Amino acid sequence: MGQKVNPIGLRLGINRTWDSRWFANKGEYSKLLHEDMRIREVLMKNLKQAAVSKIIIERPHKKCRVTIHSARPGVVIGKKGADIDKIRKLVSKLTDSEVVINIVEVRKPEIDATLVADSIAQQLERRVAFRRAMKRAVQSAIRLGAEGIRINCSGRLGGAEIARLEWYREGRVPLHTLRADVDYGVATAHTAYGTCGIKVWIFKGEILEHDPMAQDRKMAELDHAGGGGGGERRRRERDAA
């Protein structure tokens, strides 16, 4: 059933960890879960232009630490940190805890499945040919080090009368192999003819250690090796300001 299940959910606790990282006492769980859902919904709505890959929420003692992974951290921070203050106030209205906002830069958006799916959705909304958008995304991902990528586009593609599914794959994407580091992202394009669904699977190699934090460590090491640390630097600059 590896082809049917969400590849991130399948690997949780093996080499992937959750995007919400906290423990709740009995009776608090549903309240905090709904808080997380509202926070993510509001942030994604307000940061449409910031190319947000994922939002991680941690809750140390009486705090709510929100880490935004973005390909355009400058858009999130704004001039002299003005926009990030607005975001902090926005999130503070949704939770009783003290809010801390961190920004992490996504160094290679071309191999981030969520950002690739969003990019294709935006191109379809601008009436770019779906085959061209898919092929361009596949070529960029392979060029930047992905070992395999698969893209599915479904709906009334090109304004066709009958909805259909088109897919494009290059390299290999082993969905059954649990040690495989497979990133997965979905997006919806709202076109004049209706909605089109985009699904993206990107295979980035294998993670041999059995540790839920292994994938996070791998991405941090890749960022550091590629001259990363931009997100950390921006956090320090913001805190200093």
Curated annotation (Swiss-Prot):
Amino acid composition bias (Basic and acidic residues), ranges on this chain: 231-241
Domain KH type-2: 39-107
UniProt keyword annotation of Oxidoreductase present: no
GO biological process: translation
Keyword Glycoprotein: no
GO molecular function, one term: structural constituent of ribosome
GO cellular component: cytosolic small ribosomal subunit
Signal peptide bounds: none
Keywords: Ribonucleoprotein, Ribosomal protein, RNA-binding, rRNA-binding
Span list, region Disordered: 219-241
Quaternary structure (record): Part of the 30S ribosomal subunit. Forms a tight complex with proteins S10 and S14.
Record function comment: Binds the lower part of the 30S subunit head. Binds mRNA in the 70S ribosome, positioning it for translation.
Family stated for the protein in its record: Belongs to the universal ribosomal protein uS3 family.
Name of the protein in its database record: Small ribosomal subunit protein uS3
Organism: Beijerinckia indica subsp. indica (strain ATCC 9039 / DSM 1715 / NCIMB 8712)
Top-level taxonomy: Bacteria, Pseudomonadati, Pseudomonadota, Alphaproteobacteria, Hyphomicrobiales
